[in-house]
Structure formats: structure tokens, C-alpha cells
């Protein structure tokens, strides 16, 4: 159904922030005030059997408020931004129809961008093409494939590191399937999308006024994961014949480093240091995405009363007392 000039889009509050910024605490605080259902905006939480390393909400927390898009696929499978977009638009409609309030919460900014801005017409993943590229990478190395990408799509290659296997593979896959550089397809106008036009997405962004404080939280969280049995969790996954480091699930922060430790490639201390560093790099990318959203409502996530501030911002959004600019 088209959104007429008279219809008012439904406001959807979105709680976005980097790792360890307090999203779960703020979401649960809102759940104590309103009948909400949380839709996860997190590419790691979709995987089953990956609980500790993804800092998945506990069973108790998930019992207190309905959560969606958590534990929905096996680690051997893939989940795309397009799938997230379709699932989220469907879920929002179902939650509203139940008389509840949807709250989007997470830190996968690519998913949020796909939801709010739409998707370009890129070809879907092809397992055969990916297997071919994986075999070439095993033989020649990802820097060699990066060099090939630079010849056919210099714009995309210029923004990717030579060892960024996931993105190099995707860019080459797109070219092999479409015959066009991914940069050209991404620059093409997005098709009109009436489904998302029914909603106004308002982001409340949890950002640190002092990044060093957030970095300390990240280190504490990683150590807590290790103490909670993270290495054992990865070992159980590693024993499966159908899982390997080339899969998106095993590229999640921390899992690759723990896997390398279990393989004997690095020692325990190096694994810990690399895991924390990778998490900090993810945090940096997440903050960069957030700061590119001029319409966001910023809450300092390291303030002593950050949960109360985030709760206040979310309630003002939902009450119509504040809106995206």
C-alpha cells in the first residue's frame, strides 16, 4: 500500500551503539516501562551456539522481554543485509499489530543502513563462485585476489585491505556474477521502496565522550568472556566438519583469534591481545558509522547515568517529543 500524503509514518526507535556501550541495559530499562519487543540489529547474534563470544542476551533477559533475530540460523549458513531488511520490516508489522512497541537495538550499522536506505540490486551469494574464490585464495593468497580486484574495480579495491577476505570475495563474486564492478552497482539509484516508507526510523546513538573508557570496558568484557568459557565454546564449533575460518560466522570478532589459538598458531596472550584489538577496531568502525548520521540523538555511553539518559531519549522519541532531524 502506498503511503499517502495524509498518512503519518510510524516512528520506530532505534538504539544503536558500539560494543560494550550499554545497549542491553537501556533496552531492558525501556522494557520495564513499556510493552516492547526487541529486534536485534546484530550480525553475530543471528547464529546459534555462539553465545559467549557474541555477548548474547542471557536467557533471563530474553525471558523478560521478547527478542527477535537471535539464534535464527546455524553457523554454517549465511545471513545477509537483504535478509535482515526483509525480516525486520515483517517483524515490525507483526509487533505493531500485537499492540506492542518495536525497539531496534544493535551495532551492525550495515544492517541499519540497508533497512533505512534500501539496497542496491546486487546479485545474491553463489556458493559455487565462493568456493572457487576460496580455492584460489588458498593457493595464491588474498593479496593476489585483491590485486585482481584492483584491475576490474579499482574504486572498491582502494578501500579494502589486501587481507580483507570477506569483502574482497564479495566484490569479486559480484563482478563474476554481474559482469559489472560492485562500485558501479552501488552508485546506481536505489529502487523506490514503499514498505520502509511506512516508518520513520529515529536513531538514539550511544557514543563515548572518552574512547579510552570504552576500550577499558572492551578489555574487561573480553576477559569476562574468556572466564565464562569462550575457548570451550569455540572448541565445540571447531570440532564440526562443516565450519571453517572462511565462513562469516567464524569471522565474528574473537572467534577467529580463539580458533587460531586452538590451532596452535598463536599463544594465549597473543590471542587475547588480538581479540581485544579486533574488538576495538570494530568499535572504531561502528562509531564512524554513527557519526555519519546527522539525524541521530547522541547519548554519552560512559556517563554515570547513561542508562537513564538513553531511556529518556527513547521515551521522548516514542512519545513524539523528539524526532530525527
Curated annotation (Swiss-Prot):
Residues that span the membrane, as ranges: none
Domain of life: Bacteria
Record GO terms (molecular function): ATP binding; tRNA dimethylallyltransferase activity
Cofactor(s) the protein requires to work: Mg(2+)
Annotated site, Interaction with substrate tRNA, chain positions: 108, 130
One Pfam family linked to the record: IPPT
Keyword line: ATP-binding, Magnesium, Nucleotide-binding, Transferase, tRNA processing
Record region (Interaction with substrate tRNA): 42-45, 166-170, 251-256, 284-291
Annotated binding of substrate, by residue: 19-24
InterPro entries: Dimethylallyltransferase, IPT, P-loop_NTPase
Binding site for ATP: 17-24
Catalytic activity: adenosine(37) in tRNA + dimethylallyl diphosphate = N(6)-dimethylallyladenosine(37) in tRNA + diphosphate
Record-listed E.C. numbers: 2.5.1.75
SUPFAM superfamilies reported for this sequence: P-loop containing nucleoside triphosphate hydrolases
GO biological process: tRNA modification
Task of the protein: Catalyzes the transfer of a dimethylallyl group onto the adenine at position 37 in tRNAs that read codons beginning with uridine, leading to the formation of N6-(dimethylallyl)adenosine (i(6)A).
Assembly information from the UniProt record: Monomer.
Family: Belongs to the IPP transferase family.
Listed name of the protein: tRNA dimethylallyltransferase
Lineage: Bacteria, Pseudomonadati, Pseudomonadota, Betaproteobacteria, Burkholderiales
